[in-house]
Amino acid sequence: MATFKDACYHYKKLNKLNNLVLKLGANDEWRPAPVTKYKGWCLDCCQYTNLTYCRGCALYHVCQWCSQYNRCFLDEEPHLLRMRTFKDAVTKEDIEGLLTMYETLFPINEKLVNKFINSVKQRKCRNEYLLEWYNHLLMPITLQALTINLEDNVYHIFGYYDCMEHENQTPFQFINLLEKYDKLLLDDRNFNRMSHLPVILQQEYALRYFSKSRFLSKGKKRLSRNDFSDNLMEDRHSPTSLMQVVRNCISIHINDCEWNKACTLIFDARNYISIMNSSYTEHYSVSQRCKLFTKYKFGIVSRLVKPNYIFSSHESCALNVHNCKWCQINNHYKVWEDFRLRKIYNNIMDFIRALVKSNGNVGHCSSQESVYEYISDLFLICKTGKWNEAVEMLFNYLEPVDINGTEYVLLDYEVNWEVRGLVMQNMDGKVPRILNMNDTKKILSAMIFDWFDTRYMRETPMTTSTTNQLRTLNKRNELIDEYDLELSDVE
């Protein structure tokens, strides 16, 4: 029983403005839709159901029915979902605008209540006040919101969400923003609305209001790679594939500084209808390069590492070893389709082997060494603390020699030409015979930064940018970077 969805259905018939604003895919005819994946609340119609991906941001936040309108909370077009979306920091003035919008779209007064009651009482059996028949009148005005942190912005999507106790498989989390407003003022608004209802319905309204306005906020969730769909990618088999984003826009571009003012547009119905009549869509091809995706890829690589290779004498690179049960790696995983990860893995393993062999460690593929447990962490460049610890443990394992207060290890074992070039590039054009701790860190990090320079990466993919940000980046030709063209920083 989705209260918000029911309210939109019934209140849509009130006037021309409501008919335009409250149009939901969930209340229209069903059309073929993408397969659902996660359980959660559809941001468009607020019902708890199976969710599919959004074509505007790649997150799972829309139900199969609402997906036909392709609405995203990051759109520029001021549809109902966009007008319910607020950015931090939310002020009391912003909340006043939201509450006024609710009362404009979902009014409750004596005349309206009687109208709804008369339309329900078509037969004798409907003389009772059953909640199913009057669900649309039982939607209180609350400051309940689903919240998500994207890059440097926190977004609050206000609405009336039923079944808060159900399992939430999305990165959105429930937040109560009542502390941003006056509790007594909100109570007064709702008591005034409630006073026009029959006594039986008043009890249910009050119960719903207090349960949705007095709950404790939950902690923010961290985004993960699985929160984003692969369906927006041009080629799902290509590791550098671009992502196709569709955004709903209007001819009068609204500045992001005025983000929280979108809900006030409906106060001038004629102007709002004119704005909505100018709506159109913009399509962008954006890079998938970001820390979130990179961390996910290197996490898989770190679990596939065969550390025994650093003691081996194989002539082939790490990924091309065959017929050796200690060093042969399963290269049929999808992650190895990315040529950049193959290069990084081969180069790092070759360099570490050169350090091990140069410092008198005589071993074999089958050797069991204590340093093995740290080799996989050398690929977790996004986890700075863990990565630094792994490099330090490797360096200390090599038994460095103290020279004038600085510890050094040898590097006199043969390395491949690509590793040699990277070492020269980062060591002033030379291949030094000895390396200190900082030199070792510099070379190992350079092998990763050559393709995935996480120091300058966004935290989340560009699909989570606002429409104005996408438009600006597109003008500067920065939606696609060299990494997607298979060029490294050096090239």
Swiss-Prot record:
Region (Interaction with host IRF3): 320-491
InterPro entries reported for this sequence: Rotavirus_NSP1
Spans annotated as Zinc-binding domain: 42-79
Alphabetical keyword list: Host cytoplasm, Host cytoskeleton, Host-virus interaction, Inhibition of host innate immune response by virus, Inhibition of host IRF3 by virus, Inhibition of host IRF7 by virus, Inhibition of host RLR pathway by virus, Interferon antiviral system evasion, Metal-binding, RNA-binding, Viral immunoevasion
Motif (pLxIS motif): 485-488
One annotated GO molecular function: metal ion binding
Main function: Plays a role in the inhibition of host innate immunity by inducing the degradation of key host factors required to activate interferon production such as IRF3, IRF5 or IRF7. Associates with components of cullin RING ligases (CRLs) including CUL1 or CUL3, which are essential multisubunit ubiquitination complexes, to modulate their activities.
Protein name, as recorded: Non-structural protein 1
Source organism of this protein record: Rotavirus A (isolate RVA/Human/United Kingdom/A64/1987/G10P11[14]) (RV-A)
